[in-house]
């Protein structure tokens, strides 16, 4: 590694040019000051290559490098025009299609390409700062940027244009491929094939196996009526968590700084109840050691994935620290979850043998799948997937929404007025009728996930050649849709830094006074749950969990936050690293 570092540093120091000009094909505004941190600083080797290209006439439209020091919510405006052309010709006639080699982006160094950018010590692209990296790519290169030359990984093509994102999604096949996670595919398909076999689930899986699995489960998971059957037990868990919140408040009425960890417990308890008809004991005063182990395993998994997928894949040669942590976390997670899944299946068998009838809310997702398919293995793998992705994501979404409402008391007051109308008192239960009468709460969640999506980007792995933004893009390229950047682009959302739930309330009295309430929102720039056949299958359950808990919190408390602006980091999900010591002041009835 030391030799690699010396080589990279030597290459970066070779040029003494001070000009910062790069070829650029996107439409970006004026230059901004360079950042104070190392993220986004152009290397000397890039300057040298750019000048050489300029002198030889390779670029007919050079532009000055714009390096952003702005927060991710302030991005260059991207012009977009509607297009009715299919994805193969989304931007230009065939005669004007430019080769893939001309797609703008950071230049790869000899031998090590762009992999060095993600390397420790010498790299300028920190994994925890991927939000800033994507913002910088947009500012520097416009509508599209290619990060190629990643050793052991396909090229990453970042698309910052809503119309192009729409065209790619609309073109996708019956079995769309997300950018794969080789580490998870290796775990399921090689390392633990004796357990998973041909039933690998939905996460990190593609092709016929994914298609067959989804066909078996989607009709149960995606039906609105299925999710609504679990409103009563999810209400009970939220009420129990509210009691825990009351005990957590200190003498200043503030929650502990690690309140996000408490939200993990609430989300895990909710997933356990829906998936297995089991209470895991996460919210009990004495706690649950197994629940804590599940949470820690999930957190480790989400930390390890970008370490394995974005850095040089040395784990394929020898077991790196991140790889060992990844495998250990998944093994522990699988073992604990399978123990509880087994108990659920045994109980379901016993209930059936006794002829015991159950209410719809008491039939777990696992039991529904077994009844429909007769495949216990399929039901177990689905439950594992729901546990793996249903805890961290929902918890982070809840924390971000609480923060936005705490920092915008006028919006919180508007929400409270809505809640007062549907809640007879602050301890009232939530049912389907109540949830359907809270459009402003739903808009608050939508606006939060626009500003701070839990998953900052989605993507597809091209299964055939395509033309994107006027460039030929070859099969196998990983196309990334950076929704965090695009949904904070003023071209799509005027005043993107402002928390305006009214944007989502068309033709409603609740939208009165919002200057952007009647704006037509591009349907492909804010997709917090994904799109199409690979959309999150647990979306309806997650929304019920979120809306139920948030309604209870803001009906009972006035929430404020006095610890500055939330700071986020990328840990697979977009997670706040600021303390969550919200102040909760009890409201009058």
Swiss-Prot record:
CDD domains reported for this sequence: CYP24A1-like
Cofactor: heme
Any one of the GO CC terms: endoplasmic reticulum membrane
Region (Disordered): 56-90
Keywords in alphabetical order: Endoplasmic reticulum, Heme, Iron, Membrane, Metal-binding, Microsome, Monooxygenase, Oxidoreductase
Gene3D superfamilies: Cytochrome P450
EC number(s) reported in the record: 1.14.-.-
Pfam annotation, one family: p450
Annotated PROSITE patterns: CYTOCHROME_P450
GO molecular function terms listed in the Swiss-Prot or TrEMBL record: heme binding; iron ion binding; monooxygenase activity; oxidoreductase activity, acting on paired donors, with incorporation or reduction of molecular oxygen
Principal localisation: endoplasmic reticulum
Subcellular localization: Endoplasmic reticulum membrane; Microsome membrane
Sequence positions that bind heme: 536
Record-linked InterPro entries: CYP11_CYP27_families, Cyt_P450, Cyt_P450_CS, Cyt_P450_E_grp-I, Cyt_P450_sf
Task of the protein: May be involved in the metabolism of insect hormones and in the breakdown of synthetic insecticides.
PANTHER family linked: CYTOCHROME P450
The protein's name in its UniProt record: Probable cytochrome P450 49a1
Gene: Cyp49a1
């Amino acid at each position: 590694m030391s030799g690699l570092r010396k080589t990279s540093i030597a290459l970066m120091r070779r040029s003494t040019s001070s000009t910062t000009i790069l070829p650029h094909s996107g439409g970006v505004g004026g230059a901004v000051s360079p950042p104070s941190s190392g993220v986004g600083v152009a290397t000397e080797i890039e300057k040298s290559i750019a000048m050489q290209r300029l002198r030889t006439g390779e670029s007919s439209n050079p532009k000055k490098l714009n390096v952003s020091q702005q927060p991710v919510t302030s991005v260059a405006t991207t012009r977009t025009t509607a297009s009715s052309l299919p994805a193969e010709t989304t931007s230009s006639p065939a005669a004007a299609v430019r080769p893939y080699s001309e797609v703008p982006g950071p230049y790869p160094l000899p031998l090590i390409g762009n992999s060095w950018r993600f390397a420790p010590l010498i790299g300028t692209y920190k994994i925890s700062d991927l939000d800033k990296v994507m913002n910088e790519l947009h500012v520097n290169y416009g509508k599209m940027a290619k990060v190629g030359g990643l050793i052991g990984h396909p090229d990453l093509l970042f698309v910052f244009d809503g119309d192009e994102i729409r065209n790619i999604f609309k073109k996708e096949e019956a079995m769309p491929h997300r950018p794969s996670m080789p580490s998870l595919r290796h775990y399921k398909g090689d390392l633990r094939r004796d357990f998973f076999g041909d039933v690998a689930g939905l996460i990190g899986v593609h092709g016929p196996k994914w298609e067959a699995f989804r066909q078996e489960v989607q009709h149960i998971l995606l039906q609105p009526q299925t999710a609504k059957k679990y409103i009563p037990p999810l209400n009970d868990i939220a009420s129990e968590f509210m009691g825990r919140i009351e005990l957590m408040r200190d003498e200043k009425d503030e929650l502990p700084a690690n309140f996000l960890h408490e939200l993990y417990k609430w989300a895990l308890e909710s997933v356990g109840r829906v998936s297995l008809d089991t209470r895991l004991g996460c919210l009990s005063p004495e706690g649950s050691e197994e629940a804590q182990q599940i949470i820690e395993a999930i957190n480790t998994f989400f930390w390890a994935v970008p370490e394995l997928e974005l850095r040089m894949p040395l784990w394929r040669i020898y077991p790196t620290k991140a790889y060992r942590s990844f495998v250990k976390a998944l093994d522990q997670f699988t073992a604990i979850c399978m123990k509880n899944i087994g108990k659920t299946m045994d109980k379901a068998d016993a209930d059936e043998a006794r002829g015991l009838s159950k209410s719809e809310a008491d039939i777990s997702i696992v039991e529904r799948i077994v009844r429909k398919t007769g495949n216990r293995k399929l039901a177990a793998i689905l439950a594992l997937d729901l546990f793996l992705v249903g805890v961290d994501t929902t918890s982070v979404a809840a924390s971000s929404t609480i923060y936005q409402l705490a920092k915008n008391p006028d919006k919180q007051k508007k929400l409270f007025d809505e809640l007062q109308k549907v809640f007879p008192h602050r301890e009232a239960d939530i049912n389907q009728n109540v949830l359907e009468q809270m459009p402003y709460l739903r808009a608050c969640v939508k606006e939060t996930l626009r500003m701070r999506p839990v998953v900052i980007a989605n993507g597809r792995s091209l299964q055939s050649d395509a033309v994107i933004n006027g460039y030929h893009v070859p099969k196998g390229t990983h196309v990334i849709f950076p929704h965090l950047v695009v949904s904070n682009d003023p071209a799509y959302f005027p005043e993107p830094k402002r928390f305006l739930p009214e944007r989502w309330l068309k033709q409603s009295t609740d939208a009165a006074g919002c200057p952007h309430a009647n704006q037509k929102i591009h349907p492909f720039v804010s997709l917090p749950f994904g799109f199409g056949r690979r959309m999150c299958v647990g979306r309806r359950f997650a929304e019920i969990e979120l809306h139920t808990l948030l309604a209870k919190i803001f009906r009972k408390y006035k929430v404020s936050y006095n610890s500055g602006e939330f700071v986020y980091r990328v840990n697979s999900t977009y997670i706040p690293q600021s303390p969550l010591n919200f102040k909760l002041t009890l409201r009058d009835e």
